[in-house]
Amino acid sequence: MADLSLVDALTEPPPEIEGEIKRDFMAALEAEPYDDIVGETVEKTEFIPLLDGDEKTGNSESKKKPCLDTSQVEGIPSSKPTLLANGDHGMEGNNTAGSPTDFLEERVDYPDYQSSQNWPEDASFCFQPQQVLDTDQAEPFNEHRDDGLADLLFVSSGPTNASAFTERDNPSEDSYGMLPCDSFASTAVVSQEWSVGAPNSPCSESCVSPEVTIETLQPATELSKAAEVESVKEQLPAKALETMAEQTTDVVHSPSTDTTPGPDTEAALAKDIEEITKPDVILANVTQPSTESDMFLAQDMELLTGTEAAHANNIILPTEPDESSTKDVAPPMEEEIVPGNDTTSPKETETTLPIKMDLAPPEDVLLTKETELAPAKGMVSLSEIEEALAKNDESSAEIPVAQETVVSETEVVLATEVVLPSDPITTLTKDVTLPLEAERPLVTDMTPSLETEMTLGKETAPPTETNLGMAKDMSPLPESEVTLGKDVVILPETKVAEFNNVTPLSEEEVTSVKDMSPSAETEAPLAKNADLHSGTELIVDNSMAPASDLALPLETKVATVPIKDKGTVQTEEKPREDSQLASMQHKGQSTVPPCTASPEPVKAAEQMSTLPIDAPSPLENLEQKETPGSQPSEPCSGVSRQEEAKAAVGVTGNDITTPPNKEPPPSPEKKAKPLATTQPAKTSTSKAKTQPTSLPKQPAPTTSGGLNKKPMSLASGSVPAAPHKRPAAATATARPSTLPARDVKPKPITEAKVAEKRTSPSKPSSAPALKPGPKTTPTVSKATSPSTLVSTGPSSRSPATTLPKRPTSIKTEGKPADVKRMTAKSASADLSRSKTTSASSVKRNTTPTGAAPPAGMTSTRVKPMSAPSRSSGALSVDKKPTSTKPSSSAPRVSRLATTVSAPDLKSVRSKVGSTENIKHQPGGGRAKVEKKTEAATTAGKPEPNAVTKAAGSIASAQKPPAGKVQIVSKKVSYSHIQSKCGSKDNIKHVPGGGNVQIQNKKVDISKVSSKCGSKANIKHKPGGGDVKIESQKLNFKEKAQAKVGSLDNVGHLPAGGAVKTEGGGSEALPCPGPPAGEEPVIPEAAPDAGAPTSASGLSGHTTLSGGGDQREPQTLDSQIQETSI
């Protein structure tokens, strides 16, 4: 009666369904068991009525439970017990005991039963109806057992109980995490129970009379079970052994513990279950069968125990569908379980089947989970074991299988992690990583390079993250530049498709550009000779590239594309640079620039190292990789540094960007020297030439800082643009340089800061430029070289318009200075023309400075800048002179830039992690402001300089403290996290206690294991029962196989036909054509009583079609069998 009470408790949610189901099951069970009783002695005949009855009842059930059909698929694996749970299971139980075809029949039935089985799954929500079914089933089982308990007891104990317990199972799944284990173990156990039922069926027959006693014993049994329930509660993690006791007790216990232990025990059990599933299957097979045998033998309570044991089994099976519903794993589990059914010798191999069912479902569960884990890693939470397995599988199997996918996912994850800092960098990381992947396929070192690049990409992304953190306040400038960097990266990625070899350079050079300044330090002295070796340095850098895994493939790529484009440009430029460098060195300005260049690079390296310190380690690897292109640019940067020292124009935006604050005074002086020397123009020309390729790289940031500004304002020298056109043609190079700009962002961050100072210094620098201004000839030369730079800007712009985008923010800042410088340098008479253009261009640039965030805007503006500069080669030169007059307007623009950028720069500085270096830079900026102020006085433009001073000093003063404060806040946050960890430590102790409790449960399990001792004996009995069943099944299999062949009408029929051909050649033909053969065979169907088994198998297929068809195939089978016989 405990079932009734439990049913009452459980039936409360869906009593209507329970009533209907009860009616259906009662009618089906009552109607079917009669057929079963009739066929008990001859199991084959039982199968036939079962098929009919199952069709009827199953169809009615399916009609009743059509909605559950969706879960039927999930219920398929547990379809055997589900069929039993559906109430047809009693018949199926007999069928199971009868022959393996029962499983086929069960399949046939359980398609309908799937709905019914799914109904129990739905009943998982409606636990009562299932248990009501248990009660009803127990009653029909009592009836059936009265009729013939041999099979029904087994069925009731196994399948019937499975149905009843399936009812429990759904709640018990909720209440028991064990059910997943049980689902595996009980799945095997159910088959074993069935096998046990067959041998036990006689015992169960002996239990028939105890059945009544059992019902009376049920209260006492329930009492003992209640006692067990307590122990079981402790034993809930006890897995299958406890699960059997629990499940028996769970019938009573489930209502109270339906949902209580569920999640935790499910989680823990699911873990251990999946791990131990196979052993648990064995244990559960041993324990549960033994439990069942205990229920059969040790307990006359078999009705309850068997039913509850069946519940446990069904719990297991429903848990499988439940797990399938939860994990979507059940369908494969079910399918594999179905194959277990397909092995019509489930009784023979029931021990195997339990293992198969258990192993296959767990594997499917794990595989499915792993597969799900692959798509949804969050699924790992289903079970930590699955997490470990899925992780190992994902890392070992899925990564090998889908290395690219996992890598892409990992990179995506990395990108996502990067996303946390900033989406732009996330895009950069993703795009960079993906291009790396695209490149990696090209490179045979895909996987290592993937990981290396992954790591590099990761590290690169975090530096950018830091840069973002630093640039977040700068966001108007750096973020827009980051967005521009994104676009720039995207363009290189597009070119990754176009220039897979070139793009690696671009991306790698991007990173190299980041650390360019540090390497520039070394190359600063090298820059003199490096200009000559720029092309060679590409190769040398390639040799350096091996430092990173990508270096090797990149070496080839660097040598291939950059040397082609850059080498071509640089080859042409090298002679010029060589002559110019020689002239520069002869004039001794090189001596000044070397010192200046080296300190600048050092400062730049310091700033870069400070900002990129997070990035440099990965970036240094990339630097070494990218250095092939980056170093040539660095030689240029070295030259440009010299030129920077000579001209604060910020030709090499990289070094100038970083050091202009520190070097502004020498830069104007140096500018004066270059102006006086006229070779600065050549040097700048060499820069422009060398930098056309590398310029976009370093200047990518530098360009953002100075070069683009120059090119923008310099935009003169359409002829010098020709060499740039080559880089433009080698847009890959320009874009790679654009990518460097992206990676250089750390610098742009610095540059952003420097840009403020630069913006302010740019005015003084324009003032120093004004000083040399009288030297129009050198100015013109520089203008020409800047025109080359300008062409470089356009070339890089046209390919990497996005590059100007980022630089635009910085460019705008630097442009006023550049424009002023250029104006001072080129005081040509075309001022009137250039004024409008340069003023508008400068204003545009200034607007981008304030409005740097709109990358498209800035790029468009930058383009117009370069467009007028290009369109007016002479006019662009004139622009520069034009700027001489408008230089006042340019200072105004710079004022606007400083005013607009000052707050942004402040925010940037505050966020910049390397605020200390920035502090130094602001200091340098202040010095620049002063000297520039003097230069400005010389230029007659002290006001903008003063404004720049005030803005730069204020911004610089504000920057360091803000950065410090942020750092402190981070530290505080860490301390808080630590305190939380302290609480976690306490939590650790709590789990320890939980573990100890689990151990106690294990001790309870040991107690249960003592019970299992008797169960172990029972195990031997089921084993014998299995053997006996197997022998019977073998006989049935032979017949059923031929019949099954007719059922399959595919493989078995032809095979059987061949055999039949031997027996009777005439029938061989009908056999191959089962449909044709079936009709003539129909009359012969009657002779074989065994035909029903095959008929049941046929009906398994035919059940859906209809009873009449089932009978015909049966007759066909009978003929075939007769022929074979």
Swiss-Prot record:
The modification Phosphothreonine is found at T260, T277, T349, T410, T447, T494, T503, T511, T658, T915. Pfam families: Tubulin-binding. It comes from Mus musculus (Mouse). It is found in: Cytoplasm, Cytoskeleton; Cytoplasm, Cytoskeleton, Microtubule organizing center. There is a cross-link at K811 (Glycyl lysine isopeptide (Lys-Gly) (interchain with G-Cter in SUMO2)). Non-neuronal microtubule-associated protein. Promotes microtubule assembly. GO terms for molecular function: microtubule binding. The keyword Protease does not apply. This is Microtubule-associated protein 4. InterPro entries: MAP2/MAP4/Tau, MAP_tubulin-bd_rpt. GO terms for cellular component: cytoplasm; microtubule; microtubule organizing center; mitotic spindle; postsynaptic density. Interacts with SEPTIN2; this interaction impedes tubulin-binding. Interacts with TRAF3IP1. Interacts with KNSTRN. PANTHER family: MICROTUBULE-ASSOCIATED PROTEIN, MICROTUBULE-ASSOCIATED PROTEIN 4. Residues 49-103, 245-265, 315-361, 455-478, 508-529, 563-964, 1047-1125 are annotated as: Disordered. Residues 53-67, 563-579, 742-759, 812-821 have a biased composition (Basic and acidic residues). GO terms for biological process: cell division; establishment of spindle orientation; microtubule cytoskeleton organization; microtubule sliding; mitotic spindle organization. The modification N-acetylalanine is found at A2. Tau/MAP repeats lie at residues 896-926, 965-995, 996-1026, 1027-1058. The modification Phosphoserine is found at residues 5, 60, 99, 254, 381, 475, 506, 512, 517, 519, 598, 617, 667, 684, 694, 760, 798, 826, 901, 914, 973, 1046, 1118, 1124. Testis, striated and cardiac muscle. Keywords: Acetylation, Cytoplasm, Cytoskeleton, Isopeptide bond, Microtubule, Phosphoprotein, Repeat, Ubl conjugation. It comes from the Eukaryota. Phosphorylated at serine residues in K-X-G-S motifs by MAP/microtubule affinity-regulating kinase (MARK1 or MARK2), causing detachment from microtubules, and their disassembly. Phosphorylation on Ser-760 negatively regulates MAP4 activity to promote microtubule assembly. Residues 580-593, 676-706, 776-801, 825-849, 1115-1125 have a biased composition (Polar residues). Residues 254-265, 728-741, 761-774, 1093-1104 have a biased composition (Low complexity). Disulfide bonds: none annotated.
